[in-house]
Amino acid sequence: HFYKLNLSKNLPPNLIASLLPGIPLTNIGEAMKPAAMAATLVEHLWKDAQSPFYSMINTPLYRGGVISLNSIKKPIEELIKDSNNFIGMNTSSAGIIDKELILKDIYNYWEAASKVFSHAWNIRSTESRLMHGVGLWAMFMLMPKVIEKCHDEHPGVEEIITHLGLIAPYCHWTAEDGDWENVDSFGLNITWNGFENTASGKTLISKYINRTYRDVIRDATL
């Protein structure tokens, strides 16, 4: 009951996220299960040497990363709320999920992203919006759509690279990439670091990236 009792104590979100993986899902209410599952997955992402995010995520125990713990946990939590986003989310009554399948998709997708956007990878979020909460959110929201369009149910890195490569010319994660262009229906342009990690900022960039992917994949021959 530690987690429930301390929600009202204003503990730092990153500390709460780091505590959740140690709590069995059977001891957590339904409303909190997405957060607990996401925290468990994120723990694998920063601890596993095979993960594309290995040693890149800051936690209360490790401060050498470039990504905020909450910035990566929140989009995963959002995806988990809809079981259609992950094949491995067919849960049993005991709340058991196929962690390995979910991690496989996350690993492959983000390994591909690290190759396609190598210039924006593993650098401070002040230098790369891809490592910022708003960029992580947008790319995680795109992930189910990319996987759905791939030939394999659990696509490999190379196939995902082909898909992400289609949107690469339209993504402006760093200063060298220039401004984001025609972000909305009014032709809005935004500086490379102009998207804020707010609800409106995340919605705007997510809609832009999803719309761009929809348009380029429609005309692509893969």
Which residue ranges define each predicted feature?
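Accessory terminal alpha-helical modules
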Residues: 1-222
